[in-house]
Amino acid sequence: MIRFRRRTCITLSIFIFLVCLIMAGLKHLRPENAAFGSPFGLGLFPGFHRASVLEKIPDSENHLKGNTVTETNTLPAPKDKVYQLDMEEFPPPNYDLHIFYYTWYGNPQFDGKYIHWNHPLLKHWDAKIANSFPLGKHNPPDDVGANFYPELGPYSSRDPSVIDAHMKQIRSSSVGVISVSWYPPGISDDNGEPTDDFIPSILDKAHSYGLKVNFHIEPYRNRDDYSLRNNVVYIIDKYGSHPAFYKYKTDNGRTLPMFYIYDSYITTPGTWANLLTSSGSQSIRNTPYDGIFMALLVEEKHKHDILRGGFDGFYTYFATNGFSYGSSHQHWSSLKEFCNTNNLLFIPSVGPGYIDTSIRPWNFQNTRNRINGKYYETAINAALLVRPKIISITSFNEWHEGTQIEAAIPKKTAQMKYEDYLPHKPNIYLELTRKWSEKYMKEKEHWLV
């Protein structure tokens, strides 16, 4: 009996020792090439409630079970632990880091149909090339108009739980300003529906996370100096008093709202001068509706048009290095010099990569591989070299063009396999953004010395 008890004690001791050894090993594990280690394990970033969104789409889970294989090498984050973060656990928001945000997505639960996820395949303008590629529309939830698949599934931009998840992701990345894609009330892009009605929800939720919001005004039919003046008056009157409404402090001490004007070059400089110069017929300068107006620079010649048009500066938007003069990193130094000489604000735009072959199957030459985050880091580093006052990110969720930093998951169906962020976790680009945001803030302190 004594011998049996001794044997039992020895066996139990060995078992306990092995358990302790395994626990100690697990405690010190982390990905070899992770900049900060696992963001989930460190508790740095909030998790993302994919289930809370997908459960609202009745057909989605059935499709996932029957027709798809979801592949992932990552473990699911412990939802309760990761999601329940106090505000002080987020990194400080960097209000000099802006991110382009799109509100045009819809699904049957919230919008009565899929919007934008079922994007059509766009036809090439050259008939000879167009004949070599298919036409048609995507068929969500498994077939969406994107080369990557969102962790939240084909969501609705007006879903309160999605807005909350997005604000958490953005705040976790240390970005401070959301540049929301905007059309006037009752107007939308060709594949969307009007979205101005839920801007208040975005402002409210952004404020709850300490974020600011400005407006990225999209091109619409007959946009000109007169209509844009009406847009600015509407935005400032309706949203200007909201605590989340972003205002930029100028060198002379004024605080003014900032507007990005997408595709500004399609309108003549003379027309813009009517609105943006002090002597213009529609001038808003030195009125309650004055602001910082950022033009889009694509070609080199646009910088002179932008100056004549009365803009306060320009941004480059495209996340495709080499695609345009403005998006090419090698030109940022000369563009910044031009802005310094002419008292303009230069905002370079950086992005994690580019791929839009899900909607433009013929446009493979403009694909920019993410290279596991290296492309993104190279772009941000190039931006920092010119010491910009603001950097913009293209984008949080432009899924059609594959520029998103929003969380994405591996997924494949019987017909296709989506691109993914492996070997990294779904939030790797949020983590990289945080890393570089902190570097940006530290470097700016030295620039000001």
Curated annotation (Swiss-Prot):
The chain crosses the membrane at residues 9-29. It is found in: Golgi apparatus membrane. GO terms for cellular component: Golgi membrane. Keywords: Golgi apparatus, Hydrolase, Membrane, Signal-anchor, Transmembrane, Transmembrane helix. Gene3D superfamilies: Glycosidases. Signal peptide: none annotated. It comes from the Eukaryota. InterPro entries: Glyco_Hydrolase_99 (IPR026071). Its EC number is 3.2.1.130. It is a single-pass type II membrane protein. Residues 59-449 are annotated as: Catalytic. Its main location: Golgi. It catalyses: N-{alpha-Glc-(1->3)-alpha-Man-(1->2)-alpha-Man-(1->2)-alpha-Man-(1->3)-[alpha-Man-(1->2)-alpha-Man-(1->3)-[alpha-Man-(1->2)-alpha-Man-(1->6)]-alpha-Man-(1->6)]-beta-Man-(1->4)-beta-GlcNAc-(1->4)-beta-GlcNAc}-L-asparaginyl-[protein] + H2O = alpha-D-glucosyl-(1->3)-D-mannopyranose + N(4)-{alpha-D-Man-(1->2)-alpha-D-Man-(1->3)-[alpha-D-Man-(1->2)-alpha-D-Man-(1->3)-[alpha-D-Man-(1->2)-alpha-D-Man-(1->6)]-alpha-D-Man-(1->6)]-beta-D-Man-(1->4)-beta-D-GlaNAc-(1->4)-beta-D-GlcNAc}-L-asparaginyl-[protein] (N-glucan mannose isomer 8A1,2,3B1,2). One of its GO terms (molecular function) is glycoprotein endo-alpha-1,2-mannosidase activity. It is an enzyme of class 3 (hydrolase). Residues 30-449 are lumenal. Residues 1-8 are cytoplasmic. Belongs to the glycosyl hydrolase 99 family. This is Glycoprotein endo-alpha-1,2-mannosidase. It comes from Xenopus laevis (African clawed frog). The gene is manea.
